[in-house]
Amino acid sequence: MGIAFILIVIAIMTYALLVMPRTTMRPDMSDLLTNYAHRGFFDNNDGVPENSLEAFRYAVLGGFGIELDLQLTKDGEVVVFHDYTLKRMCGADVKLSSLTLDELKGFNLLNTGYKIPTFKEVLKLVDGKVPLLIELKGESGDDSLCPAVDALLDNYRGAYSVESFNPLLLKWFKNNRPDVVRGQLVTNLLKEKKGGSFVRNLALTAMLTNCLSRPDFIAADQRYLRGLSIRLCTQFFGAKLFVWTVRKKEHFDINKENGDLSIFEGFDPLS
């Protein structure tokens, strides 16, 4: 009985240490504690595509923070785009990473006149008017996106944070830019039946990889907010909770009542 109890205690302590967010020398997040327009304030059915300069312009006009997605082109340029292929947004079944920036500029977003913007163009447009929530895209151990993004942000004077599903990308910022606020994106990969091994998906769902990145906040799927690791990080260790993707005003209001922040789309939370 004594040995079993000790083993249980060790297991609980190990789990807590793996899941634990950053708890010391936390950076100031006060300028980031707002709600964010998911991929800008867009309407894909009304001529304002997601992750377009126009969607970001509308978010700035509304005073909303902006959540956006970053990837690298074949020639190493940082662009703003969510999917790994152009099929859904541009009608071409080709990987973004296989194209140069000049080649990407030959495509329009959803039959509009808008192009896939560079991160540099977005920074110039936003110019510190609203905070940025920057998702770093990438499913492998290649972290070359991180220094490229950091170089563009080096002279940017607006408020921003980075987030990713990939803890290895957050680890780069932990090791090289600990002053930058970083957040772990999480969903239930087991229930969503995403690709990858069971062990990988279990570890990411339970955020056992937080030991690599020690995030400052958790950006959690609206559908899976009751996960034990999410509650441990936010309610016990005090990490801030960002909730995505909030598509109903009633969920937005509940998050607000709970003191949580929303990454929203499809409605105006001020109306």
Where are these regions (language model features)?
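Phosphate-group recognition and catalysis centered on beta-loop-alpha active-site segments
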Residues: 1-271
